[in-house]
């Protein structure tokens, strides 16, 4: 996919850079594979804001994407590649030989008419195919990787992302993630071949605040421009720097403060993403 720039007929057009989606399917999604999606505006069941700066945005229907890929040894044909407003990656509509249809995350270089298959045994190493990590060749680029067998893919699902299988050790697979982290995952966990589609997502520029609002994101106010009643960084005469290390509106350290506390899975991380990049 290429990027699209525009003739600056307005100030916001001058900055606007979007992904050219002209090659994607232009119709509606398969209705049987969609659900209704109600906007929360960042409010919980009491009507209180639990996630700030969320609201508005275009109406969406939720596409049911198959992250588990547990339809084994039945070949599927890619009908088309579609846009999905609920994620940064594109999705592919797959029709299996028994007539069932499903949406999967579309990897790069997957096109309409291609065949894909998922198996518990070794299959061809080509984009969109899924198999256990123990059968994937070392060095392969993979996405939609499970962390627990049968739970469905959790690692490398957003646009342009991927993990690399760098080795094996006692039934475990060693993965290198985009963050620089190296971690162990069980060899029986499934993973799909290839990198996720739409790598140009990283280069888009909305050009104006309104386009960000169309996505459901409201203006993000810094604490340093608030009053003391609203934020620990608020107040002061004139422009101030906050006067303390960065904290959240509730006084907890932020901006680089590490919050991970899952001791039981520390042993799965061989190399932290925080270690100096060699």
From Swiss-Prot:
Residues 218-278 are annotated as: Disordered. SUPFAM superfamilies: Nucleic acid-binding proteins, Translation proteins SH3-like domain. It comes from the Bacteria. PROSITE patterns: RIBOSOMAL_L2. GO terms for cellular component: large ribosomal subunit. One of its GO terms (biological process) is cytoplasmic translation. One of its GO terms (molecular function) is rRNA binding. InterPro entries: NA-bd_OB-fold, Rib_uL2_dom2, Ribosomal_uL2, Ribosomal_uL2_bac/org-type, Ribosomal_uL2_C, Ribosomal_uL2_CS, Ribosomal_uL2_dom3, Ribosomal_uL2_RNA-bd_dom. Keywords: Ribonucleoprotein, Ribosomal protein, RNA-binding, rRNA-binding. One of the primary rRNA binding proteins. Required for association of the 30S and 50S subunits to form the 70S ribosome, for tRNA binding and peptide bond formation. It has been suggested to have peptidyltransferase activity; this is somewhat controversial. Makes several contacts with the 16S rRNA in the 70S ribosome. Part of the 50S ribosomal subunit. Forms a bridge to the 30S subunit in the 70S ribosome. Belongs to the universal ribosomal protein uL2 family. This is Large ribosomal subunit protein uL2. It comes from Rhizobium etli (strain ATCC 51251 / DSM 11541 / JCM 21823 / NBRC 15573 / CFN 42).
């Amino acid at each position: 996919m290429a990027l699209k720039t525009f003739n600056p007929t307005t100030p916001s057009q001058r900055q606007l850079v979007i992904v050219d989606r002209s090659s994607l399917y232009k119709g509606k999604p398969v209705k049987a594979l969609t659900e209704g999606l109600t906007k929360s505006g960042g409010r919980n069941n009491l009507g209180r804001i639990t996630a700030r700066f969320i609201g508005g945005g275009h109406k969406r229907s939720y596409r049911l994407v198959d992250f588990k890929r547990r339809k084994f040894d039945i070949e599927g044909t890619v009908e088309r590649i579609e846009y999905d407003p609920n994620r940064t990656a594109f999705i592919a509509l797959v029709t299996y030989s028994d007539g069932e249809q499903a949406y999967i995350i579309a990897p790069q270089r997957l096109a309409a008419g291609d065949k894909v298959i998922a198996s518990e045994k070794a299959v061809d190493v080509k984009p969109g195919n899924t198999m256990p990590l123990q059968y994937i060749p070392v060095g392969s680029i993979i996405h939609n990787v499970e962390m627990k067998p049968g739970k469905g893919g959790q690692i490398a699902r957003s646009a342009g992302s991927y993990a690399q299988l760098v080795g094996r050790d006692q039934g475990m697979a060693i993965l290198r993630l985009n963050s620089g982290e190296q971690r162990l995952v069980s060899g029986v966990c499934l993973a799909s071949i290839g990198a996720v589609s739409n790598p140009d997502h990283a280069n888009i520029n909305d050009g104006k605040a309104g386009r960000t609002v169309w996505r459901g994101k409201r203006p993000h106010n810094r604490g340093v421009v608030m009053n003391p009643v609203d934020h620990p960084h608020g107040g002061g005469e004139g422009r101030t720097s906050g006067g303390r290390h960065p904290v959240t509106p509730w006084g907890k350290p932020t901006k680089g403060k590490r919050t991970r506390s899952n001791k039981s899975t520390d042993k799965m991380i061989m190399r932290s993403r925080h270690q100096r990049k060699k």
